[in-house]
């Protein structure tokens, strides 16, 4: 907090943006304070069975770019090393660096989808061979909750990037603005894939429920048949 306060004084950052940057979690957003562009991107990584979310707050001015990170840096730390190792990249302007950061944040979304997809497809194969147990059903609902929240994050990030593409903001040049289209397309692709995975989960659950209903129906008919067989000798004995 003291370091952020010193940065606020040095670069004359808006108090509302500083206050927001100190909070560990908040949805993606884009605000303009005078000549300062304030962007919040949501980072994500898969930890065990759950998606862990972080936050990257980015202050972009005409001659500075400041990031405040909450959560694991992951590949973002490597991006900083790459940019610092190549002064020509920094020389392209702060808007180019902002694009590089958002692009790297979004790049981390695809591995999350791929790992969850492997789990879902394995469950789909099991459902074709055998009945899903209670643990499997609980897993389906858990994955559905994780993917639904992930989809909300993707939607908010897509809206943020679309604003950067379509709007006119301080520190974002007309030359760099089209580059954000690539980030927007990347988010849209992951959104579509997550939608498809949610549909697969629903299909797996419905198919499993249908098989279970059929199994119960078969058992019920078998019990009814045995009951009829047992009832016949009883009826004969009573004559």
Model-derived features with residue positions:
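Peripheral, non-transmembrane regulatory/ligand-interaction domains of membrane transport proteins
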Residues: 1-175, 179-182, 186-196
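Hydrophobic alpha-helical transmembrane segments and their immediately adjacent juxtamembrane loops
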Residues: 12, 185-239
